[in-house]
């Protein structure tokens, strides 16, 4: 399970206020019931803030296809801070970002049947310099800063 997007220096023109995730017709994904009264957020894979240049682009980030059951502390903490850093990096060059969801043996399955990823890996390609930076997070409350999650992957 993965998602790929391009991050460029887009001007913020719209806000996400009041938006919520919706189902994509004909595709079975998690839904609002999977996030009810537990520690998981609807974690954006392609961040809403990266696509807030237009309502159309922003709206595309609010499909359940673009979210994962993400530990709330990870989503609101180190993952969010890495997303903010991406937006700084894309001020000077275009980024291609691939987010991998990893389901290790014994991954959590909720009562609703939804699968919780064990890990999330963000591969960021800096198109101007031709380099990769990769960050791997266990889907738990982080105990170190996002910078400490950088790993070496061969691409």
List the predicted regions and their residue ranges.
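Domain-level detector of nuclease and nuclease-like folds
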Residues: 23-155
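Glycine/proline-rich, flexible active-site/cofactor-binding loop segments
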Residues: 1-30
